[in-house]
């Protein structure tokens, strides 16, 4: 129901290549620590999503929040601050209804800031709809997409394959 793309700041390639150089994309796909290095890496990440079928923002955010809370509880990073940040996340999606096509974007900074944006077309909005300052919640959003219990195994495969190609100088 959702198309997802993950974009990494250009300095991600040398940062990741230092540790993962020489691995095949198949090895990377099955290496959780590779994805955890992406999630916690000292570079910006942009997650671009687009709905394929109509969906209420509240329904979408409920599932994302459930996955994030479950992950944070499993790794011991869920507390009062995270509960408050999750509520702010829910609030940002409350009045959003996704038609097929328009974008939602997550901007993740290395210092734990999660910016949320919504676009009625394919442009990136200049102003974010919400900013959540909580490193555990920010990391959990991407963790649920490419981590241990990923909602998108294809995204993991594509990410590993493209990073490997870029490392070898192949433009994708």
UniProtKB/Swiss-Prot annotation:
<comment type="function">
    <text>Catalyzes the intramolecular cyclization of bicyclic chalcones into tricyclic (S)-flavanones. Responsible for the isomerization of 4,2',4',6'-tetrahydroxychalcone (also termed chalcone) into naringenin.</text>
</comment>
<dbReference type="InterPro" id="IPR036298">
    <property type="entry name" value="Chalcone_isomerase_sf"/>
</dbReference>
<keyword id="KW-0413">Isomerase</keyword>
<comment type="similarity">
    <text>Belongs to the chalcone isomerase family.</text>
</comment>
<feature type="binding site">
    <location>
        <position position="2"/>
    </location>
    <ligand>
        <name>substrate</name>
    </ligand>
</feature>
<dbReference type="InterPro" id="IPR016089">
    <property type="entry name" value="Chalcone_isomerase_bundle_sf"/>
</dbReference>
<feature type="binding site">
    <location>
        <position position="67"/>
    </location>
    <ligand>
        <name>substrate</name>
    </ligand>
</feature>
<feature type="binding site">
    <location>
        <position position="144"/>
    </location>
    <ligand>
        <name>substrate</name>
    </ligand>
</feature>
<dbReference type="Pfam" id="PF02431">
    <property type="entry name" value="Chalcone"/>
</dbReference>
<dbReference type="GO" id="GO:0009813">
    <property type="term" value="P:flavonoid biosynthetic process"/>
</dbReference>
<dbReference type="InterPro" id="IPR016088">
    <property type="entry name" value="Chalcone_isomerase_3-sand"/>
</dbReference>
<feature type="site" description="Important for catalytic activity">
    <location>
        <position position="60"/>
    </location>
</feature>
<dbReference type="GO" id="GO:0045430">
    <property type="term" value="F:chalcone isomerase activity"/>
</dbReference>
<comment type="pathway">
    <text>Secondary metabolite biosynthesis; flavonoid biosynthesis.</text>
</comment>
<dbReference type="InterPro" id="IPR044164">
    <property type="entry name" value="CFI"/>
</dbReference>
<keyword id="KW-0284">Flavonoid biosynthesis</keyword>
<protein>
    <recommendedName>
        <fullName>Chalcone--flavanone isomerase 1</fullName>
        <ecNumber>5.5.1.6</ecNumber>
    </recommendedName>
</protein>
<dbReference type="InterPro" id="IPR016087">
    <property type="entry name" value="Chalcone_isomerase"/>
</dbReference>
């Amino acid at each position: 129901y959702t198309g997802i793309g993950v974009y990494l700041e250009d300095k991600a390639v040398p940062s990741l290549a230092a540790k993962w150089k020489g691995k095949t994309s198949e090895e990377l796909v099955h290496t959780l620590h590779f994805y955890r290095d992406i999630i916690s890496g000292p570079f910006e990440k942009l997650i671009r999503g687009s709905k394929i079928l109509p969906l209420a923002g509240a329904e979408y955010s409920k599932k994302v929040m459930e996955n994030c809370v479950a992950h944070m509880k499993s790794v011991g990073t869920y507390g009062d601050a995270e509960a408050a940040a999750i509520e702010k996340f829910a609030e940002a999606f409350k009045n959003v209804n996704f038609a097929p096509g328009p974008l939602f974007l997550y901007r993740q900074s290395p210092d734990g800031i999660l910016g949320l944006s919504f676009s009625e077309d394919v442009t990136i909005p200049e102003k974010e709809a919400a900013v959540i300052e909580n490193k555990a919640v920010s990391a959990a959003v991407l963790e649920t997409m490419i981590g241990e219990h990923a909602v998108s195994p294809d995204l993991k495969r594509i990410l590993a394959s493209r990073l490997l190609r870029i490392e070898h100088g192949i433009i994708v």
